[in-house]
Amino acid sequence: DPLWSRGLGDVYKRQPILHSGDLVNWSLVNYALPVQEPKEFFDKAQHGKGVWAPSIRFHNGEFYIYWGDPDYGIYMIKTKDPKGKWSNPVLVKAGKGMIDATPLWDEDGKVYLIYAYAGSRSGVNSILVISELNAEGTEVVSDPVMVFDGNDGKNHTVEGPKLYKRNGYYYIFAPAGGVANGWQLVLRSKNIYGPYESKIVMVQGQTNINGPHQGGWVDTNTGESWFIHFQDKGAYGRVIHLNPMNWVNDWPVIGADKDKDGCGEPVTTYKKPNVGKTYPITTPPESDEFNTRHLGLQWQWHANKQDTYGFTTDLGYLRLYAGSLSKEFVNFWEVPNLLMQKFPAEEFTATTKLTFIAKQNGEQAGLIVMGWDYSYLPIRKAGDKFILQQAVCKDAERQNPEQVKELASIPVEYL
């Protein structure tokens, strides 16, 4: 059955593991990274840092995940049971700017690692390089060899490579052109180090699916090929799409190739993959009654969790504690003890019951919609009153202050 790992969201990327039997109905089953390393660094909210474009692979009875951290290097973890405990992260190659790593175990026993570079950290980008790994896959043992240069202007911002081998060809699936408006590029060569031919195999075309790229090729047990990729939708995150993939003259064609030029457009409706059986409709969890001893997998903290942020119970509620804000506090951009989940849809309603027990003046609790621009509804203790407020912050990453207005108040003794 297919497994899928991704860097979830902008901040705390614990490597969620999703499982499916048919590539359509997915269940969130685990997190491969209970704590993000280095721990001291990620105890604070770190936007745009940590796990970038992980790849999950199965080899010799074990599941592997490789990813690039643009500030620390390329990491690897592994397990025999993806729903169980994963190994501690191994730093395969230390350095700045290395991102989007994917391994390949070749028939001759050699192990290769392809990755890209983030210009914001390394000063170079739009290139793909391949290094050799040791047999255990735990250490890079050769210098990087550049196999593709997108700085000629035709395929700028090439990144996110996935490496495969089929019919004697090495294939590199890589997005180019930028996250929001790019396209899906495929390279092929008979030699791991090239030279590689290149071809654009999927573009937005006449659809409303912008930037259809950066994903992985999956084969079903019935011989079908499919491509899972994302579409960037701004504040709503990176929405996942599934497109059919066919092979023509040893080139993949992704989506609907209406004019038969070898380059497809993403489909909006299509028949489900044929996997030999039917699976029930499944969606990731959203609602939570907070009546179990484990926090629902849909929830993530804004940074590495500390025990004193809150406690689960069997009693139908989650007990949260207020944290102390630093003297330099401007807004919630770097505050770690926010408990959040991704938007379930573009439009939705959230309902909750909150009991507020304030021990000190200035304590607050409430509901927040968090992002570069954010807004929240807090209840704050202010002297002898509880105040319901609305707070809005624009461009929080630029350390802009919140704009707060009072909506209602009630005397403490009234309660």
Where does each model-flagged region fall?
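Asp-box/WD-like beta-propeller blade repeats and closely related beta-sheet repeat scaffolds
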Residues: 68-107, 115-117
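Loop/turn-rich, solvent-exposed surfaces of beta-rich toroidal or solenoidal domains
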Residues: 154-196
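Residue-level detector of Asp-centered blade-edge/turn motifs that repeat once per structural unit
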Residues: 58-61, 105-109, 165-168, 219-222
